[in-house]
Curated annotation (Swiss-Prot):
It comes from Drosophila virilis (Fruit fly). Residues 1-27, 141-198, 343-380, 392-451, 465-492 are annotated as: Disordered. Residues 189-198 have a biased composition (Polar residues). One of its GO terms (biological process) is genital disc anterior/posterior pattern formation. This is Segmentation polarity homeobox protein engrailed. Residues 12-23 have a biased composition (Pro residues). SMART domains: HOX. The gene is en.
Length: 584
């Protein structure tokens, strides 16, 4: 932009002996077609005025003419901007435009005083060219330097005034692109907002130190391609941000390797948590853990001891009260489980022990499996204090060990066979219907080939994701105690009664209470007999016709109403097969 070029502190003239290093300038493309500003080509001697000391007077004259032309153009631009502000009051302008044009007005007044005082070009080469980004007021010396070096790119052009008149519709910068130096496209806000009658630019482009440094580097660089790419990046509207991002010295601390390592650690932690959760779930589902189910474990061991005591009368059976001394009242669940567990088993006589024999039983504990059961039950403190230390240690290890190690320890320590968990019978006992027959018989075959009776309440615990759907097995039908004499005799209707009932049925299939009472008095029958006859007659007609309501057809198609008493029609069979997915 022309305004940016005039107000930018980075475009000061170079000191003598060096090439000019101001960034490539873009003129403001004025949007009104009748007001266009064209650069008047100046002689090439204005560029190398500092390199030819012999032609100092000519260079000073040309430089003064150039300054006057710039002043005239700056005044025109200021008037144009004031007209635009008056015409488009509702358009939002960048907050930096007013400050920039105030600085331009101050600059014009100062320049006129300087030119009236002395026209020497050396006075305009004051070297302040790095204004801080926070400064919004441009000093007089810097303003002179800015104006002195603002149109260096236009002095190097070789186009004539006729060429500029032909290229009226082209930006002023395009006429200067024939020079040897690499020119840049106009900024993004000039390319995309040609139709908007406003002057909007960023204050960071004017007051940025980084952009001036980047422009110097691109001017002094040897590689043309690198300088063009860096200057193109700096020519966008976010030039300071692009330059600072490109000049980042330290890379990011969070690299791709760190990201992969972090994701790998997360996956490992998730896998460990999943494994621990699955192990805990397996321990709870595959066996009756004594810590989780103390009552169930106690009942299992009690039923096992009863069976072993029935086979071996000399076996020592600890009384039940010994296992549940702290809980004086027996829970209803435990009593019910014991009662159910004794169904279908041989009744064993439990030896009654006197209180004097209890210390001897505690002093000589039963096998290790019983000791571990006692220590893991509700009377842990009383049992562990009297039983051997080996029994307590085996109990403590059995609480924390896996089911397989617990079973192996019981095999090594005790002579009787351990009770296998329900998972040994069926892993998916809640899903399959094959366990219905097992629960009816109540016997399973262990690894040793020995037939063992399981208590019936074991199969009441369901490991299923389905809701409750009734009993787990079919109950055997109870033998009917009623004899044929107690049954109600079948009513034998006479021909006159049947004829009258049929005639009434043909008139109306449903009887009212008054009509039923009249028929009862006329035919000498009970009201219940007449009502039942009408119900049976309606059912026979319904079966013979085979017509079903739509709800029954829908339920049959879903398999929820599959009564086989009525044969299905072809349409119903086809509908049912289609609903079941047998036919497409």
């Amino acid at each position: 932009m022309a305004l940016e070029d005039r107000c930018s502190p980075q475009s000061a003239p170079s000191p003598p002996g060096c090439l000019p290093h101001s960034p490539p300038q873009q003129h403001q493309h004025i949007l009104q077609p009748n007001l266009r500003i064209h650069a008047i080509p100046i002689s090439i001697t204005a560029l190398d005025m500092s390199l030819q000391p012999g032609t100092a007077a000519t260079a000073a004259t040309l430089y003064q003419q150039q300054q006057l032309q710039h002043l005239h153009q700056l005044q025109q631009l200021q008037q144009l901007h004031q007209q635009q502000l008056a015409a488009s009051a509702g358009v939002f302008h960048h907050p930096s435009t007013s400050a920039a044009f105030d600085a331009a007005a101050l600059h014009a007044a100062a320049l006129q005083q300087r030119l009236s005082a002395s026209g020497s070009p050396g006075a305009h080469s004051t070297g302040a060219c790095s204004t801080p980004a926070s400064t919004l007021t441009i000093k007089e010396e810097e303003s002179d330097s800015i104006l002195g070096d603002s149109f260096h790119n236009q002095t190097a052009t070789t186009a004539t005034e006729e060429d500029e008149e032909e290229d009226d519709d082209i930006d002023v910068d395009d006429t200067a692109s024939v020079s040897g130096s690499a020119r840049l496209p106009p900024p993004a806000h000039q390319q995309s907002k040609q139709s908007k009658p406003s002057l909007a630019f960023s204050i960071s482009n004017i007051l940025s130190d980084r952009f001036g440094d980047a422009a110097k580097q691109t001017k002094q660089g040897d590689s043309t391609g690198v300088s063009v790419s860096a200057a193109a990046a700096a020519a966008s509207i976010f030039r300071p941000f692009e330059a600072s991002r490109a000049a980042a010295a330290t890379p990011s601390a969070f690299t791709r390797v760190d990201l992969l390592e972090f994701s790998r650690q997360q996956q490992a932690a998730a896998a460990a948590a999943t494994a621990a959760m699955m192990l805990e779930r397996a321990n709870l589902l595959n066996c009756f853990n004594p810590a989780a189910y103390p009552r169930i474990h106690e009942e299992l061991v009690q039923s096992r001891l009863r069976r072993s005591a029935a086979g071996n009368p000399n076996a020592v059976l600890p009384p039940t009260a010994k296992l549940t001394e702290p809980s004086v009242e027996k829970s209803a669940l435990g009593s019910l489980c014991k009662t159910v567990s004794q169904i279908g088993q041989a009744q064993s006589t439990t030896p009654v022990t006197t209180p004097s024999s209890r210390p001897s039983q505690l002093a000589s504990p039963p096998p290790a499996s019983n000791a571990s059961t006692i220590s893991s039950s509700s009377s842990t403190a009383a049992s562990c204090s009297a039983s051997s230390s080996s029994g307590c240690s085996s109990a403590a290890s059995s609480l924390n060990s896996s089911p397989s190690s617990r079973l192996a320890g019981a095999n090594n320590a005790s002579s009787p066979q351990p009770i296998p968990p329900p998972s040994a019978v069926s892993r998916d006992s809640g899903m399959e219907s094959s366990d219905d027959t097992r629960s009816e018989t109540g016997s399973t075959t262990t690894d040793g080939g020995k037939n063992e009776m399981w208590p019936a309440w074991v199969y009441c615990t369901r490991y299923s994701d389905r809701p409750s759907s009734g009993p787990r097995y079919r109950r055997p039908k109870q033998p009917k105690d009623k004899t044929n004499d107690e049954k109600r005799p079948r009513t034998a209707f006479s021909s006159e009664q049947l004829a009258r009932l049929k005639r009434e049925f043909n008139e109306n299939r449903y009887l009212t209470e008054r009509r039923r009472q009249q028929l009862s008095s006329e035919l000498g029958l009970n009201e219940a007999q007449i009502k039942i006859w009408f119900q049976n007659k309606r059912a026979k007609i319904k079966k013979s016709t085979g017509s079903k309501n739509p709800l029954a057809l829908q339920l049959m198609a879903q398999g929820l109403y599959n009564h086989t008493t009525v044969p299905l029609t072809k349409e119903e069979e086809e509908l049912e097969m289609r609903m079941n997915g047998q036919i497409p």
